[in-house]
From Swiss-Prot:
GO BP, one annotated term: glutamyl-tRNA aminoacylation
Species of the source: Thermoanaerobacter sp. (strain X514)
Its job: Catalyzes the attachment of glutamate to tRNA(Glu) in a two-step reaction: glutamate is first activated by ATP to form Glu-AMP and then transferred to the acceptor end of tRNA(Glu).
Gene behind the chain: gltX2
Keyword NADP assigned: no
SUPFAM superfamilies (UniProt xref): An anticodon-binding domain of class I aminoacyl-tRNA synthetases (SSF48163), Nucleotidylyl transferase (SSF52374)
Full protein name: Glutamate--tRNA ligase 2
One Gene Ontology molecular-function label: zinc ion binding
Length: 479
């Protein structure tokens, strides 16, 4: 096999969404698996809708996911002369022609087709204009489009690596436009010229592009160019099997980033949207994907987007992430919540992260779970208050805890646990009668990391103050 060359060609008219990210990833994995090249091309010929901001977001999203490119970004808007050159070649060879039909004429054709129960197609009115007619129209200042002369008989077959052979009857295509009247190429024409000039060997893209493929093959054939191999990956659908949209929650890479998902988790999850490793495992790193990725193992069936599964995978990565790396990525979320400023104790934060990460699913969750280490506890969980602060002996138990904790030295998770266990025996109560109200008093919550981990991280003074504050709260509540 010659060198594999694939491309990802986003339009900078919006965000990098989960479907686009998966297309980029599958191309990248295929290139890396085969020791080939991954090219980033920008389909920005729609100048009105293309924005720099959108392009910046797409590039940042790819970098964040770890999808690096070997060539590019190559902008179509900077290659307009190339498209004109190839269009002129087709005109010269009689494989394309100028069309001067007005909007009104085209509308009339559409209405006539509708009347006759035919699909609306261009009738080929300008297909056989004489050289003199063309010159006269041009002299009048009419701006033509250029149409491809599509064979009116036969079939065009897409040999698809994932879907097998897909046949299209040429009679279903009209002589479609390849260059618009403003001298800009159409999507299909620019795509073919680019794929040829960039030496693309495999076109891996979403199933929604399958209907474009026969038109692109017809252009390749008219130009006498070698046709690349095609692979159309299935759509990513919402859980109700409808088209994925904003109403189904976050769908862009930037939104996932802002909501505290890790790039490794996103990459792991979107790889599963249509592909699975040989051993069937659902958690795997990118090196395994590169080693095993083949198009033959990509599913034909639609992939169902499941945010709960993504969140479960993200939780796995949070629990197993390198602690320093996790601390680094949590810090911006702590700043966003004003828990810390620019001046902070990195080692202290790292210790807290190490104890809270076991239960959390996103970086936002991790930051939220750290709140009571940086802010005062001013309210307590209602269900905890009802369950633990209303018990008859709770004030006496907590008062005894304060007295006992004042004597603990050094104050760490081992000494506090030993002290509390002795106190339980001394008071002849269950451990829950002491542990649960203490947790609620010092954190405001009924759940979280180990109680004695929390005590150690809060320190002696804050732990005691918070228990005293809770005693005060309970006594006022009882009045």
């Amino acid at each position: 096999m010659s060198e594999v060359r694939v491309r990802f060609a986003p339009s900078p008219t919006g965000s990098l969404h989960i479907g686009g990210a998966r297309t980029a990833l599958f191309n990248w994995l295929f290139a890396r698996h085969n020791g080939g090249k991954f090219i980033l091309r920008v389909d920005d010929t729609d100048l009105q809708r293309s924005t720099e901001e959108s392009m910046k977001g797409i590039l940042e999203g790819l970098k964040w996911l770890g999808i690096d490119w070997d060539e590019g970004p190559i902008y179509q808007s900077q290659r307009l002369e190339e498209y004109r050159k190839f269009a002129n070649k087709l005109l010269k060879e009689g494989k394309a022609y100028y069309c001067f039909c007005t909007k009104e004429e085209l509308e009339e054709m559409r209405k006539q087709a509708e009347k006759e129960g035919r699909p609306p197609m261009y009738t080929g009115k300008c297909r056989n204009l004489t050289k003199e007619q063309i010159e006269e129209y041009l002299r009048q200042g009419k701006k033509p489009v250029i149409r491809l002369k599509v064979p009116q008989q036969g079939k065009t077959v897409v040999h698809d690596i994932i879907r097998g052979d897909v046949e299209f009857d040429n009679s279903t295509f009209d002589d479609f436009i390849i260059m618009k009247s403003d001298n800009m190429p159409t999507y299909n024409f620019a795509t073919v010229v680019d794929d040829y000039q960039m030496g693309i060997t495999h076109v891996i893209r979403a199933e929604e592009h399958l209907s474009n493929t026969p038109k692109q093959i017809l252009i390749f054939e008219a130009l006498g160019l070698e046709i690349p191999q095609f692979a159309h990956v299935s759509m990513v659908l919402a859980p109700d099997r409808s088209k994925l949209s904003k109403r189904h929650g976050a769908t862009s890479v930037q939104e996932f980033r802002d909501q505290g998902y890790l790039p490794e988790a996103i990459v792991n999850y979107i790889t599963l949207l249509g592909w699975i490793p040989k051993d069937g495992e659902e958690i795997f790193d990118v090196s395994k994907s590169i080693k095993e990725f083949t198009l033959e193992r990509v599913s034909k069936n639609p992939a169902i987007y499941d945010v709960q599964k993504l969140t479960w995978i993200n939780g796995h990565y949070i629990r197993n992430y390198d602690l320093d790396k996790l601390t680094e990525v949590v810090i911006p979320f702590l700043k966003a919540k004003n828990f810390i400023g620019e001046d902070f104790d990195y080692d202290y934060i790292k210790k807290i992260v190490s104890v809270v990460r076991e239960r959390e699913k996103t970086l936002v969750d991790v930051a939220d779970a750290m709140s009571y280490y940086f802010t005062e506890v001013n309210e307590y969980e209602e269900k905890g208050v009802k369950k633990y602060f209303t018990k008859e002996k709770v004030v006496d138990i907590l008062k005894k805890a304060v007295v006992t904790l004042k004597e603990v030295e050094p104050f760490n998770k081992f000494t506090t646990e030993e002290t509390y266990r002795k106190l339980v025996e001394e008071l002849q109560i269950s451990s829950g009668e002491l542990f649960h109200p203490t947790r609620l008093a010092i954190s405001g919550r009924t759940f979280g990391p180990g109680l004695f981990d929390i005590m150690e991280l809060l320190g002696k003074e804050r732990t005691i103050k918070r228990i005293e504050k809770a005693i005060d709260f309970i006594q006022k509540m009882r009045k």
